[in-house]
């Protein structure tokens, strides 16, 4: 099926590049042909052709634009898609055409009924006395090097079959007698298990924390949450009736599989933590509160307080599943929650501030607002050492350290302060025409791309008259017209792609500055 076609393969990229190149060449040839169909101008004629009245060049010019414009627009769409494909291959935000289709046009959640919570954990169901997991939780691991492993696993409890990626520290051996902690890492939307590991550079960062004694030996697990096309577009944290049982997948199947494959992993809640980015950050916090018998701590990076996607965002469920509400009203064992976002991330900054001072008896909620970074992989990667250091100090993370903590520190200055007042008009105008999210920049880019799009067929037509008056062979004229058409077409495609990217970035609130955007996207280009 076309929905299962991979969009991260080199074959797909080469196919897109070939189609785009063919479209550009054919469009340039069309533009040249339209220009060369015009007869030599007579005195008083401007850009006349042999098919119409020479006294009506404007009408004939419109016909040329209408003839070539669809081809130019197709090229712009193809170039935009090609650039997006190249970026996606590096960031691994979506893996198939079906995932992209679901993100663009998500289907509404058919149910607003929350299913029962899973009762299992790494050692098996809570009603099972034996800590030995069932044999059906075994899976075959593919060694990808540098401590990375991959498996496609079928969860017996959830019925979900999907990818899980696992990182093991240096010199890991199943029989080394070491008790390993487990950090479960959840990706956001869009995202994949591979993208979150690579974007956060998680292996080297966790290994460095282990080497420095900041955290005990730890295995990192990144399950895919794109368990079907619905979840790829509108992911859940919980088991929503009528949808895939993602909650059971994360809370029971993945932990049991990990403990089966890595028997040295701990089974107590102090040894297990969740962390996530964006929507995965909310899911990490939500799951830790709901299953505090399995997970003792969570890291919420650029997540939200009120659920805004998935089944929990339904009005019938969202109020009861807001994090601040769950922390104060939901019965749970004491947990630690590390919450972080950037001041310039308008999508979640207020949600982060709402969690200051939240928490029930025994909970520890630490809030940090980074001065900049937006909603980006660069920010999350930079903040991983801070999260790991925080996690390593939590009671129970190191076996035998269950003593109560001291009072939580005061939130960072940026987190404690309310949002800044609106800047003066000159500052806002400057930001509008220089900042990556500025409306002025996008307006100018949009107008320029429209003008270039229209100029693609018009300029060669005008240039044809100039070349005819200057003499020269027909072949030379055709080459000059082709070069002019190609330059204009490529410029129009580039400017249109940039304009679309700026609009998407503003809507998504991803990158607050040009430099942050280049840090994330530049390597892909």
Tell me the role of every PLM-derived stretch.
Residues 1-525:
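Non-catalytic cap/lid and distal C-terminal segments of serine-dependent acyl enzymes
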């Amino acid at each position: 099926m076309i929905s299962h076609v991979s969009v991260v393969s080199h074959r797909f990229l080469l196919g897109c590049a070939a189609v785009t190149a063919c479209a550009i060449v054919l469009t340039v040839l069309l533009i040249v042909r339209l220009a060369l169909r015009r007869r030599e101008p007579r005195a008083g004629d401007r850009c006349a052709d042999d098919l119409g009245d020479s006294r009506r060049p404007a009408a004939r010019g419109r016909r040329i634009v209408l003839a070539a414009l669809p081809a130019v627009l197709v090229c712009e769409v193809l170039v935009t898609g090609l650039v997006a494909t190249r970026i996606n291959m590096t960031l691994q935000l979506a893996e198939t055409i079906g995932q992209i289709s679901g993100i663009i046009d998500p289907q509404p959640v058919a149910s607003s009924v929350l299913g029962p919570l899973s009762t299992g954990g790494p050692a098996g169901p809570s009603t099972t006395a034996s800590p030995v997991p069932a044999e059906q939780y075994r899976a075959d691991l593919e060694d990808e090097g540098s401590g990375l492993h991959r498996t496609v696993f079928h969860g017996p409890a959830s019925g979900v079959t999907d990818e899980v990626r696992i990182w093991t520290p240096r010199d890991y051996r199943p029989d080394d007698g070491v008790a390993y902690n487990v950090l479960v890492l959840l990706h956001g939307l869009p995202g994949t298990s591979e993208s979150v590991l690579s974007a956060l550079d998680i292996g080297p960062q966790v290994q460095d924390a282990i080497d420095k004694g900041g955290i005990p030996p730890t295995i990192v697990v990144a399950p895919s949450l794109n368990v079907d096309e619905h979840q790829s577009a509108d992911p859940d944290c919980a088991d929503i009736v009528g949808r895939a049982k993602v909650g059971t997948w994360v809370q029971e199947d993945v932990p049991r599989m990990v403990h089966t494959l890595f028997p040295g992993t701990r089974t107590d809640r102090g040894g297990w933590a969740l962390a996530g980015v964006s929507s995965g950050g909310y899911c990490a916090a939500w799951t830790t509160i709901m299953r505090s018998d399995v997970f003792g701590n969570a890291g919420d990076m650029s997540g939200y307080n009120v659920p805004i996607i998935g089944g929990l965002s339904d009005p019938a469920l969202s109020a009861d599943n807001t994090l601040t509400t769950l922390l104060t009203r939901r019965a749970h064992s004491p947990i630690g929650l590390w919450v972080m976002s950037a001041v310039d991330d308008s999508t979640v900054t207020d949600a982060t501030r709402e969690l200051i001072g939240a928490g029930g008896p025994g909970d520890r909620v630490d809030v940090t607002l980074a001065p900049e970074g937006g909603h980006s992989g660069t920010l999350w990667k930079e903040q991983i050492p801070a999260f790991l250091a925080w996690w390593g100090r939590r009671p129970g993370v190191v076996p035998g350290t269950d003593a109560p903590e001291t009072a939580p520190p005061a939130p960072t200055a940026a987190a404690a302060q309310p949002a800044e007042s609106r800047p003066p008009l000159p500052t806002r105008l400057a930001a509008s025409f220089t900042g990556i999210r500025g409306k002025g920049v996008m307006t100018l880019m949009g107008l320029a791309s429209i003008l270039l799009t229209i100029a693609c067929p018009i300029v060669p037509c005008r240039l044809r008259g100039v070349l005819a008056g200057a003499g020269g062979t027909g072949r030379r004229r055709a080459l000059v017209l082709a070069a002019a058409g190609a330059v204009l077409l490529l410029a129009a495609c580039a400017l249109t792609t940039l304009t679309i990217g700026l609009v998407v970035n503003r809507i998504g609130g991803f990158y607050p500055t040009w430099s942050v955007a280049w840090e994330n996207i530049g390597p892909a280009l």
